[in-house]
UniProtKB/Swiss-Prot annotation:
Organism placement in taxonomy: Eukaryota, Metazoa, Chordata, Craniata, Vertebrata
Biological process, per Gene Ontology: innate immune response; regulation of oxidoreductase activity; regulation of protein complex stability
Protein name as catalogued: Evolutionarily conserved signaling intermediate in Toll pathway, mitochondrial
Subcellular location, principal: cytoplasm
Top-level taxon of the source organism: Eukaryota
Keyword Cytoplasm tagged: yes
InterPro entries per record: ECIST_C, ECSIT, ECSIT_N, TPR-like_helical_dom_sf
Length: 414
């Protein structure tokens, strides 16, 4: 009788949950037991899946990311909108992955506060393992992988986590989780590699092109005695016809050893202006030009006495314990290159603008007035896109410019 009462009560509960009429819930013996077993193990009725509401999907948040003004305030506003919508935070993985894709568009990819805000989207104390078996396996793997992707993006942009990041990860996943291990590795290596570069690039680059060129040339030049000279400052000139003509900057650098090397150059051998060569400073790419010559085949290296050479010292320290297979020296193919006499940075790769650099070098290097100068210029990115105003100029003005450049070019080749 006790078993029968339990089966009848279970039948009533199933009838309430599935909407079965109460009259069908009455039964005795084996019939009641069969009905309860059938009700407990029956799959849901076949049919098309019910459409979820648009509020529970992540697609509206993609639309919000596209619709809002792309700044930090609107990005945080979208995250607050999601957090205040539902306490259970359904779809939190999708919204975090969508936010990671849009961070560069909003300009917050290097903001630590925004990354902590993304981690705050996870529900708290839900994914913490409760026993050693859950800790042994990857507990809630999708959520842990999503948090690791957030930390990896922080690592790619060089952002060091803080104590709030650790507190959020402990509150969300616990102390033995994979995101915590990732956080510990980042905190171990980031402080060690933060100051390894002896020539660090400043976080904020100067906006002035002359100061930026001065800083870049100092980074390229290996001689501390190098002198930077500004041959032309950027300015705007008004022509007689009322049009404004913009003059770009020209900044060069040369060391005393390069001056002496150029003074010993044979005037009958031409020198070359080559470029542009790219130089990356974080996300900014600048271009520089060099003045060089071909290697002199008649030049003989001065033989150094063994007593005065550092490569042939008087005392030899032979490692007799090493075998021939222990040679860890590198096999380097020495490529003989020509001497580099000077470097410069200019607003454009125009021969007329670089000619002002050569004329400025003639003041400290008189031999350039007797040496032919040949321009070997590649099509840089600034020359690929021709403005529409220059394309619309009449042919007469272009011929006048060519006429002005021709005597300049002949004088340099003499």
């Amino acid at each position: 009788m006790r078993t029968l009462r339990f089966l009848i009560s279970a039948r009533h509960l199933c009838a309430r949950g599935r909407g079965i009429p109460a009259g069908q819930a009455l039964g005795t013996g084996n019939n009641a037991q069969k009905q309860v077993t059938c009700c407990l193990h029956t799959s849901p009725p076949p049919g098309p899946p019910q459409a979820t509401s648009s509020a529970g999907s992540v697609t509206p948040y993609e639309d919000v990311f596209q619709r809002e003004q792309r700044n930090k305030a609107s990005f945080v506003e979208v995250l607050d909108l999601y957090c205040n919508r539902d306490v259970r935070r359904r779809g939190h993985v999708e919204i975090i992955e969508a936010a990671l894709r849009w961070m560069t568009e909003f300009g917050v990819e290097k903001d630590l506060e925004v990354y902590n805000k993304l981690l705050d989207v996870f529900p708290k104390e839900v994914f913490v393992p409760q026993n050693y078996i859950q800790r042994m396996f990857n507990h809630y793997p999708r959520q842990q992988e999503c948090a690791i992707r957030v930390l990896e993006q922080m690592e790619n942009y060089g952002i060091t986590p803080n104590k709030q990041t650790c507190f959020l990860l402990l509150q969300i996943f616990g102390a033995r989780s994979h995101p915590i291990r990732k956080y510990q590795r980042m905190m171990y290596w980031f402080p060690r590699f933060k100051h390894t570069n002896p020539f660090p690039v400043p976080a904020e680059l100067p906006a002035d092109p002359v100061e930026l060129s001065r800083m870049c040339l100092h980074r390229i030049a290996n001689d501390l005695d190098s002198r930077v000279a500004v041959y032309q400052m950027p300015y705007t000139e008004k022509c007689d016809d009322g049009k404004e003509r913009e003059h770009l900057h020209v900044v060069g650098i040369q060391s005393p050893s390069q001056v002496s090397l150029l003074a010993a150059h044979n005037p009958s051998t031409p020198v070359y202006v080559e470029g542009p060569f790219p130089l990356w400073l974080r996300k900014t790419c600048v271009y520089y030009y060099i003045l060089r010559a071909d290697p002199d085949p008649m030049r003989k290296e001065e033989e150094i006495d063994n007593e005065r050479s550092l490569y042939y010292p008087l005392s030899l320290d032979l490692e007799l314990d090493r075998d021939l297979g222990d040679d860890d020296s590198f096999d380097v193919d020495d490529v003989e290159e020509g001497p580099v006499f000077a470097m410069c940075m200019a607003g454009s790769g125009d021969e007329l603008l670089l000619g002002k650099w050569i004329r400025g070098l003639q003041e400290t290097n008189p031999i350039l007035g007797q040496t032919p100068v040949v321009f070997r210029l590649n099509s840089g990115p600034q020359e690929l896109s021709v403005p529409q105003e220059k394309e619309a100029e009449p042919k007469g003005e272009l011929e006048d410019d060519e006429g002005e450049r021709e005597p300049e070019r002949r004088r340099m080749e003499q």
